[in-house]
Regions:
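Short, surface-exposed beta-strand/loop "edge" segments at domain boundaries and coil↔beta transitions
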Residues: 12-17, 48-52, 68-71, 93-97, ...
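Short, acidic/charged, Gly/Pro-enriched secondary-structure junctions
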Residues: 2-13, 45-80, 105-124, 154, ...
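Short, solvent-exposed secondary-structure boundary/capping segments
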Residues: 76-91
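Charged- and aromatic-enriched interaction segments used to assemble
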Residues: 89-179
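Juxtamembrane "anchor/assembly" segments of surface/extracellular structural proteins
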Residues: 1-54, 89-95
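A generic structural signal for beta-strand entry/edge sites
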Residues: 37-41, 81-85, 168-172
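Well-ordered beta-strand positions in beta-sheet-rich domains
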Residues: 27, 71-73, 85
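Short, exposed beta-strand/loop patches in secreted or surface proteins that constitute
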Residues: 28-33, 74-78, 163-165
Length: 179
């Protein structure tokens, strides 16, 4: 079975159109652990066209996942005589470096209201939630990922609960994300 995925150079953020190079990997897989790690892996052969040369750290790959077409950032690559393997993570994880909560205080808010406040510092990110629980949390000098998924008592998951689903630059934290 032929797999075709799109690769975007690190500086290309136009994900609405075709990427800079279509890849034809031997395999591409996504592994997600509920409220845990999300990883993708690709294995690409050394091909005559030189597609494998485009696989570089910080490039973005668009591939099909269990929850639709998703964007993943290449975090690590390794080359062998047979090909290139790469480890990727959801682009939402970019928020570790570019969505900082200097002093954010969702006070007596439900899940959706809290996520709206938490994602306000960087409009690239958004959140969805059906959680009706009313709670309060204070986030000072935290990145968005720490604030939502961190192990501290004040994290979104510890205050409001829920299950996490990453969907490109949107995070869904619902009572349940599965069936």
């Amino acid at each position: 079975m032929l797999i075709r995925i799109e690769l975007y150079k690190p500086e290309n953020t136009d994900y609405e159109h075709n990427g800079d190079m279509p890849l034809l990997p031997e395999s591409a897989s996504v592994k997600a652990i509920l409220n845990g790690s999300w990883k993708a892996e690709i294995q690409h052969p050394i091909d005559e066209e030189g597609r494998w040369k485009w696989i570089e750290e910080d490039a973005v790959v668009k591939l099909e996942s269990f929850n639709g077409t998703q964007l993943f950032r290449i975090k690590k690559k390794a080359k062998s005589d047979a090909g290139v393997s790469a480890e990727l993570e959801p682009v939402f994880m970019d928020a570790i470096d570019d969505c900082f909560l200097l002093d954010i205080r969702p006070t007596e808010k439900n899940g959706q209201q809290a996520l709206d406040i938490m994602t306000a510092p960087n409009k690239k990110y958004s959140g969805k939630s059906n959680i009706k629980i009313i709670s309060t949390a204070y986030y000072q000098t935290k990145n968005l990922i720490e604030a939502i998924c961190g192990e501290e008592e004040n994290s979104f998951l510890n205050r409001w609960g829920g299950e996490v689903l990453f969907d490109n630059y949107t995070i869904t934290v619902n009572d349940r994300v599965g069936i």
